[in-house]
Every structure is written in C-alpha cells, then in structure tokens.
Amino acid sequence: MGTAELSEIAAAKDLQVAVAESLTAGLLASAIGSGAGAREWFRGGVVAYQTGVKNEVLGVDEHLDPCSPEVARQLAVGVRGLLRADLAVATTGVGGPEGDDGHPPGEVYLGWATADAVGHRRLELEGEPHEILAATVDAAVELLTSLAADHE
C-alpha cells in the first residue's frame, strides 16, 4: 500500500485526513503531501517533536511517557480535532540509534482517531534510524489507507 491508494480512497470517499508527528518529524506529511491529488483530502499535519508542543498544541497529558500508546492516541485525537479531519494518524517512539528512557530503538506507536473510535498499533522495528523512520512512515500510510477503506 502506498500514498496512491490512500489518495484514491480518500478522494472517492471525500475524506479529510490529518497527521501528528513526533518521531517522524514531518516525513509522513511530506510523503502524503507529495502524492497526486493530496490537496483535495490532506488537511495537513503538526510536527510535535518536543513534549511541550504535544501538550500545548495537541492537548497531550504532560504526565505521560512520550513513547507510549496513550500519547500516540492523544496525538491523533488532538490533530483530528485541531484540523477538523475525518481521520488522523500520529507517530511517536524511539528512532535510535540509542534507546530513550528505557525504550529501545525501534519501539514505535501509531495512534489513530476517527469520529467513532481511537486506537493504536505498536511496532517493533529494527535498523538504522533512517530505516526505522522510513518503516514508520510506510506503516502509518498503510494504517491510514486501511482506516480510509473501512470508513463508512
């Protein structure tokens, strides 16, 4: 699955999509935004790399571990509301090369939010930092495509 399939489904269903990024620092929005027709359905994204931005802009609870399923979910809910999207996906985790606060490199969480549901996926990725980021973007696009396909 790639951005072309996501674009086709989102456009056909007249969906509006948004992303919140911590780990991927804009790579996901870039991948989506470079696709044909994205301006019709891609609302945009928020890069919330620092914890303060997560809290202040997207309403993430400041007491949570930034590398957690709950933060991933809150990021998705926050950006969906902020950008008035039908569905949203968020990325957070540790890209490496070193671990962070007890989390190993490659521990990644994708959060998602629609009008009716919120959830997350945990990924355990291996490789160099650029490989972990690329795999995270691919997984996020796949998740968005699946959410769009299932959207009623």
Task: Locate each region found by the language model.
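Short alpha-helical segments enriched in small residues
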Residues: 1-152
